[in-house]
Amino acid sequence: MSRNRAAMVSAFRLFLRPATTTTHRSLALRLAPGTTFALHLRPCHELQQHRSFASTAEDGETDKHKKPTTGEDIYVEYVNGMPHMTVRLPSRNELCQFALKPISHNVGDLLAMLRAEDRGIDRAAVINKHGVRIASSCTIESLLDDSFSIQINNRTLDVNPPKRDKVTLESMDKVGDVRKVIAQLYEAFNVGEYQLEKSNQLAKELETLRYELEPLEEKKLELSKKAARRTNFMTWMGLGLMSVQFGILARLTWWEYSWDIMEPVTYFVTYGTTMAMYAYYCVTKREYMMEDVKNREFSLSLYRNAKKVQFDVEHYNELKRKSAELEYNLRRINDPLNMQLPSHLVRTQENTPPTLTEEKAERKYT
């Protein structure tokens, strides 16, 4: 009986010994759970690589911010709104981070940066998820919209970029409202001061132009008086010639000849006058109106005399046009009704300055 009891105790001890060993082994393996995961799920040639980059408690805190998407060989993260790509370079098997600009950088720039950092890269290409190569002109912004892969020499690295926030229509409306408020605040604080400063500036420019125009105005006044005298003389001379014609026709009709003879003569005289008026229209492209004829003669005489005394009419007209624009703008700024309106929305458009095209057209016909 005692022998049986001793045998049972020995068997029980032998039964407990491997269980105790297993317990100790399990406790030893629990000290490194990452290593346990590598032993059970990874092949032997990746064991050393995984042990080199096993995460610690501090790395866990960092991973909360970086959040790699496709493992440790390559991943994309956003730092201060800008994408940063971390890639393991093949030559020294080191991680290298590249800061990318979504709009100004493209795929060609990314590949050039990879080759510049590692001279051992012979072939590099970017492939989309359908296996089609992406052109070098594709922007980084478009590239990061979907998953892709980078082929470096004989390795293919898959990348799943994190989703980024895009601008929506509602956010644009909010930005527009903020801009309106800022514009109203700027107008309330600065428009009055700006208009006063602009008014003083226009007044100074107008004063300078008037000082420059003063001697030219005197010469132009002399030329205008001379042209007016010539035009007035031509007007009265035309009336005198018509009176002489009337007297000659009357003399020939009632004294020298009879009406039967002079009737066809007066007809041809009248028809000749009509032909002269039509010839005037063919030359000037304007109807023969007394006021237009007088103005045309005045302009011709003025330009002819200005050329004789070397008066620069083009420069004078340019100064007058600038002066008219300054006066118009100054009047518009000082008008309380039109103070905050642009030039094409003013309520009073009287006495607007002539444009350069209108001046050229008028000069062409005169």
Curated annotation (Swiss-Prot):
Bias type Polar residues, positions: 346-355
Residues of the transit peptide: 1-53
The organism's place on the tree of life at top rank: Eukaryota
Annotated membrane topology: Multi-pass membrane protein
Record note on disruption phenotype: Mitochondrial calcium uptake defects. RNAi-mediated knockdown in neurons and mushroom body neurons, from third instar larva to pupation stage, results in impaired mitochondrial calcium entry, decreased synaptic vesicle content, increased mushroom body neuron length and field volume which lead to decreased intermediate-term memory after conditioning. Does not affect olfactory learning.
Comp. bias regions, Basic and acidic residues: 357-366
Key words, A-Z: Calcium, Calcium channel, Calcium transport, Coiled coil, Ion channel, Ion transport, Membrane, Mitochondrion, Mitochondrion inner membrane, Transit peptide, Transmembrane, Transmembrane helix, Transport
Catalysis: reaction(s): Ca(2+)(in) = Ca(2+)(out)
Membrane-crossing segments per the record: 233-255, 265-284
UniProt cross-references to Pfam families, sorted A to Z: MCU
Motif (Selectivity filter): 259-269
Main location: mitochondrion
Localisation: Mitochondrion inner membrane
Tissue: Expressed throughout development, from embryo to adult stage (at protein level).
InterPro entries linked to this entry: MCU_C, MCU_fam
Keyword Transmembrane helix: yes
Topological region Mitochondrial intermembrane: 256-264
Activity regulation information from UniProt: Inhibited by ruthenium red or its derivative Ru360.
The keyword Transport is assigned to this record: yes
Family: Belongs to the MCU (TC 1.A.77) family.
Domain observations: The selectivity filter, in which calcium ions are arranged in single file, is composed of two acidic rings separated by one helical turn along the central axis of the channel pore.
Function: Mitochondrial inner membrane calcium uniporter that mediates calcium uptake into mitochondria. Constitutes a pore-forming and calcium-conducting subunit. Mitochondrial calcium homeostasis plays key roles in cellular physiology and regulates cell bioenergetics, cytoplasmic calcium signals and activation of cell death pathways. Together with Itpr, has a role in oxidative stress-induced ER-mitochondria calcium transfer. During pupation, required for memory function in mushroom body neurons.
Record's protein name: Calcium uniporter protein, mitochondrial
Organism: Drosophila melanogaster
